Amino acid sequence: MSKCPRCFTALNPNQYLWTLPEQSGGTRYRDEVATAYSGAPADCGPLYTWSRSPGYNGPPPPTSEATRALQAPAVEICPVCHFTLPEGWREGHAICIALAGARATGKSLYIAVLVKQLELLCERFGVSMQPVTRGTAQAYATNYETPLYVQRGLIPPTPTVRTQTSDHREPLMFSLGIWHGVRRFLVLRDVAGEDMESGDLHAPPFRFFAHADAVFFMFDPLRVKTIRDQLHDLLPAQVVSGGDPRTVLTNVLTAVSPGQPKLAVILSKFDVLRALRDVEGSEWGLIMSNGGAAYLRDTSDGQQYDETDGQLLHEEVRSLLLRLHGGSILAAVENPATGVRLQSRNFVVSALGHPPSGNRLHARGIAPFRCVDPIRWVTSGFGVL
């Protein structure tokens, strides 16, 4: 059973809904459902619905039946949020990931680099990773690829749900090819740090958290003053902003409830911590010079996700978080106030490999580190990647 790429709700095989796209012309109606879930005014054409009758075990009607009823080429939409479903979406399997973190944790940079790394990984497996829609291709190119890979600069912060343009509202949908006889899709949804810090996460635009297969919570080590102080002379000047990651994590866990997705706790911008190797006489310098540590090795491009390495890394990152005064984050994950502990794992990633200089990339370019680890932890459970 696949999921809607916007609300992440499992698509009910007993309920189908079609409408006419805007380009078909004809009367348009304000769509209160789509407006609520997108956070922006939306309209739709006339609707055609089908619900399975008691005792009927046959297939649902084809789209051609809706086309005849609506007298124009119909498109299928999600019965819950009215998002237009790509052709063949129900027949595939969508793995849905939500990304969360305070402002300036590097979520957008991570997405930009992650897609490139996944393309290379899929190529190694002999499958092609492609955008599912032109909307995804355009959104990725405009919001992620061009600022980072073409302009060689950093990516602007993700707009809030109330200020987003249409290409920011578009979930990023990618086809991962055929695995075990089923077409697999990967859906990525990024949420503005400002929304995570102070938004109403019970509102319809954020209900996808409860239905996600996994939530990636990203934590920036530069939020720790003792780390910033030790790196003062080693790194270019950094703009430190964003809310308290503990508050954001609490909000994330509230938004997730009552769902039970996997939770990846990701120490982002790990290149910052690796720079501590050059701090002479520092405890952190010794920690970051441990050549046997899993957090200094990148095994993420192996033939399959290395569960043993993943568990070792999990424990090492747990220790790092304690040293980073992140005990409250670990407590929220391991003993949450909701009373429901999610399956979780700790990771380190570096999207760039080297700290940027202001708003420009480091002269050495982009050197990603362990970026696909969290994704492979999730997809390997489905026999993918």
Swiss-Prot record:
Disruption phenotype: Secretes greatly reduced amounts of EsxB, protein is synthesized intracellularly. In single deletion mutant EccCb1 only rarely localizes near the cell pole, while disruption of the probable saeA-saeB-saeC operon completely blocks polar localization of EccCb1. Loss of DNA conjugation when disrupted in recipient strain (MKD8). The keyword Cytoplasm applies. This is Putative ESX-1 scaffolding and assembly protein SaeC. Its main location: cytoplasm. May be involved in assembly of the ESX-1 / type VII specialized secretion system (T7SS), which exports several proteins including EsxA and EsxB. Involved in DNA conjugation in recipient (MKD8) strain. The lineage of its organism: Bacteria, Bacillati, Actinomycetota, Actinomycetes, Mycobacteriales. GO terms for cellular component: cytoplasm. Keywords: Cytoplasm. Transmembrane segments: none annotated. DNA conjugation in M.smegmatis is unidirectional with distinct donor and recipient strains; mc(2)155 is a donor strain while MKD8 is a recipient strain. Mutations in a donor strain that alter DNA transfer do not always alter DNA transfer in a recipient strain. It is found in: Cytoplasm. It comes from the Bacteria.
